[in-house]
A protein has these predicted regions:
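C-terminal catalytic domain of Rieske-type non-heme iron oxygenases
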Residues: 1-204
Length: 204
């Protein structure tokens, strides 16, 4: 398995004693599950190719209704992942570090785009790729908002050390977790309730 965490925010339209929560799951060794609005969810798999390259698989799904061709095309365009335009024949993003991700500074100046980038996946890629293939973590200065990053790294290091030193099974191979039921969730909850009580792990 891995771990999960929740973002907890004050609501705008609900009563003052309500909170909006959204959970995110890290599932070892390289999966992320993210909640979305209107029953949408997302799965990302960052599969290592070698020490400096990673293949990203991005899946969008709806828990309540089928996704028809029109909606599928809309989701692909929203993500900035249109084959032949955003993705080349080798599955590489056409907007990349070499061309500054084709950032449109004019659109930013005109107020037409906050980032000047096409698609949410490109925005994420800029953050990831701009660090370079291998980043020197010793120069990082993580803060309290990075607690999930800290926890994930600690978890992975513990798993590696446990495997190398004591022969413990790798993370994800020795837990009785119903993987088919793991999902990220969002909800409006009472401030007197914990998000763990509302979003119970592994329940349908």
């Amino acid at each position: 398995y891995g771990f999960r965490y929740a973002a907890i925010r004050r609501t705008i339209a609900e009563e003052e004693d309500k909170s909006y929560i959204r959970t995110t799951l890290f599932v070892a060794p390289f999966y992320g599950l993210f909640a979305g609005q209107k029953n949408w969810g997302a799965l990302q798999a960052f599969v290592p190719i070698d020490d400096e390259n990673t293949m990203l698989y991005f899946v969008r799904y709806n828990l309540k209704q089928p996704v028809d061709d029109k909606e599928r095309e809309r989701q692909i365009a929203w993500s900035g992942l249109i084959p032949g335009i955003d993705i080349d024949d080798n599955f590489r993003m056409t907007r990349n570090r070499e061309n500054d991700w084709l950032q449109d500074r004019a659109a930013m100046e005109d107020g037409k785009s906050a980032s000047g980038l096409r698609g949410v996946q490109v925005e994420d890629a800029v953050i990831q790729e701009s660090m370079g293939p291998i980043f020197d973590r010793s120069t990082e200065h993580l803060g309290t908002t990075d607690i999930a990053v800290v926890r994930m790294r600690r978890l992975m290091l513990q798993a590696v050390r446990g495997f190398m030193k004591d022969g413990k099974p790798p993370l994800g191979l020795n837990e009785q977790i119903p993987y088919e039921r793991l999902r990220a969730e969002e909800a409006i909850i009472s401030q007197n309730t914990t998000w763990q009580d509302v979003c119970k792990l592994g329940q349908p």
